[in-house]
């Protein structure tokens, strides 16, 4: 029986393209039908933010042939490629093996140094799945959905250059609205807590916590701090600013948000299924990638 596998490649990087060819050859020798696509298919409106209306919704990012019959998909690229690939695979419930050919590789499971071993493990079925929560980010105007995307890391809504500070009214479930004056706001998943939100002063959240994090960007108040709340609460952001704002999702999807729009964020029924080839200890990843918990002064060897 012929099995089916996906290959999602950052085709703008020569190293990823070259590696993809060798991975595809190895899979085909193991009786896999390989469907190879570009990770650019997961980028939503990023290059053309004026192209606002996307009536088909976020499931339109899933490539042809990526369905329930696919055993897994291998992602070749950096963290940005993984974020794009998440939109291409999560709605179809396809597990992904992330192989880093980029820089930091915070979301990577394997590297070029252990590529052959990783491919052997995935072919023999020697792997587990870790699920990560996603949000659905929708731009609404009255009752019309004007734009929508799946979000693994964060949604950032902020001012354009050379414009003044922004004002937001944020509604969280049935709670009283929150008013924030800042350069922007970030709403992140636990996975995204180590990305843009961390740089803006938000806390690190372990991936298994069912929460949302709201982090202001350069707030104009000493009392304005990051807020963490249950992810069962839908969030609506109302821009109270006369100028248009820029919304960016996961660093590679986005559009303009106008004063008459509102941004709705809610937990998605689709999660990203990461393939784990070995024990994935989160604190160890923090230590290795971000230097968390390292001593400030080197200790002498015994």
Swiss-Prot record:
GO biological process: one example: NADP biosynthetic process
Keywords, sorted A to Z: ATP-binding, Cytoplasm, Kinase, NAD, NADP, Nucleotide-binding, Transferase
Chain's role: Involved in the regulation of the intracellular balance of NAD and NADP, and is a key enzyme in the biosynthesis of NADP. Catalyzes specifically the phosphorylation on 2'-hydroxyl of the adenosine moiety of NAD to yield NADP.
Active-site residues annotated for this sequence: 79
Full protein name: NAD kinase 2
Keyword NAD: yes
Pfam family, one: NAD_kinase_C
Compartment(s) of residence: Cytoplasm
InterPro entries (alphabetical): ATP-NAD_kinase_N, ATP-NAD_kinase_PpnK-typ_C, NAD/diacylglycerol_kinase_sf, NADK
Cross-referenced HAMAP family: NAD_kinase
EC code: 2.7.1.23
Cofactor: a divalent metal cation
Binding-site residues for NAD(+), renumbered to this chain: 79-80, 153-154, 183, 194-199, 218, 252
Catalytic activity: NAD(+) + ATP = ADP + NADP(+) + H(+)
This protein's record includes keyword Magnesium: no
Similarity-based family: Belongs to the NAD kinase family.
High-level lineage: Bacteria, Bacillati, Cyanobacteriota, Cyanophyceae, Synechococcales
Disulfide links within the chain: none
A GO molecular-function descriptor: metal ion binding
GO cellular component terms attached to this protein's record: cytoplasm
EC class (word): transferase
């Amino acid at each position: 029986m012929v099995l089916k596998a996906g290959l999602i490649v950052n085709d703008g990087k020569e190293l990823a393209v070259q590696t993809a060819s060798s991975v595809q050859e190895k899979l085909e020798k193991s009786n896999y039908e390989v469907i190879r696509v570009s990770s650019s298919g997961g980028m939503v409106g990023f290059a053309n933010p004026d192209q606002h209306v996307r009536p088909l919704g976020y499931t339109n990012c899933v490539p042809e042939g990526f369905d329930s019959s696919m055993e897994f998909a291998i992602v070749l690229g950096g963290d940005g490629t993984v974020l794009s690939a998440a939109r291409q695979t999560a709605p179809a419930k396809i597990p992904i093996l992330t192989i880093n050919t980029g820089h930091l590789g915070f979301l990577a499971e394997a590297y070029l140094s252990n590529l052959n071993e990783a491919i052997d493990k995935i072919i023999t079925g020697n792997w587990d799945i870790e699920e990560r929560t996603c949000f659905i980010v929708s731009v609404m105007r009255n009752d019309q959905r004007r734009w929508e995307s799946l979000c693994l890391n964060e949604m950032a809504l902020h001012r354009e250059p050379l414009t003044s500070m922004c004002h937001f009214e944020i509604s969280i479930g049935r709670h009283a609205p929150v008013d924030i004056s800042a350069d922007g706001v970030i709403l992140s998943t636990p996975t995204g807590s180590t990305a843009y939100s961390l740089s803006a002063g938000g806390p690190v959240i372990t991936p298994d916590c069912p929460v949302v994090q709201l982090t202001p960007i350069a707030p104009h108040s000493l009392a304005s701090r990051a807020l963490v709340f249950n992810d069962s609460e839908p969030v609506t952001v109302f821009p109270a600013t006369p100028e248009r704002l820029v919304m960016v999702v996961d660093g590679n999807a986005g559009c303009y948000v106008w004063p008459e729009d509102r941004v709705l964020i809610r937990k998605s029924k689709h999660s990203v299924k990461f393939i784990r080839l070995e024990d994935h200890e989160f604190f160890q990843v923090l230590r290795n990638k971000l230097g968390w918990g390292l001593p400030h002064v080197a200790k002498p060897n015994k």
